[in-house]
Amino acid sequence: METPGVLLVMGVSGSGKSTVGALLANKLGWKFYDADDYHSEENRIKMGKGVPLNDQDRIPWLCSLHDILLRDVASGQSVVLACSALKKMYRDILNRGGSDVPPRSDESAKEEPLAGGKFLVVHLCGSFELIYGRLLQRRGHFMPPELLQSQFSILEPPSAPENFIHISVDKGLPEIAAAVLEALK
């Protein structure tokens, strides 16, 4: 992958997005963003109460993330983003902006492609049981394990024509990182 580019590490909560994304950014020397850090307080409160987010909750968040990625890519900085990006529409917003969503009052909803073909989606996938078990062990996160089923219900795994790879979270962290680095060659 020629720089600048974007590596989107996606999957349901508990799939290891943040851990894998941070490791890859470190190995590649790229900037790392964890999308969870950019949720509005309202979204955090809603999830903390066990209420799943809907498209209206997610779209402004995704448009803001697109703007951050666009700024970095435009300045020549390659980026790793850890983000659930459960639906194709969400991944499209991250890559191309929000022109296919209802208009907003600000200018960030304009379509501005990030990196053309330099947008690789890494889908970290695993069984509900495995990931639910991980969530039960996790402490200090605003996303309760009870919301996992709602994420699996709306998940649209990447498929052609998206530029993607699926990686099982049954593998160890070194194996996952090696598979992604190989895909970037």
Curated annotation (Swiss-Prot):
Pfam families: SKI. Keywords: ATP-binding, Kinase, Nucleotide-binding, Transferase. InterPro entries: P-loop_NTPase, Shikimate/glucono_kinase, Therm_gnt_kin. SUPFAM superfamilies: P-loop containing nucleoside triphosphate hydrolases (SSF52540). It catalyses: D-gluconate + ATP = 6-phospho-D-gluconate + ADP + H(+). Its EC number is 2.7.1.12. CDD domains: GntK (cd02021). Disulfide bonds: none annotated. Coiled coil: none annotated. Pathway: Carbohydrate acid metabolism; D-gluconate degradation. Belongs to the gluconokinase GntK/GntV family. This is Probable gluconokinase. It comes from Rattus norvegicus (Rat). The gene is Idnk.
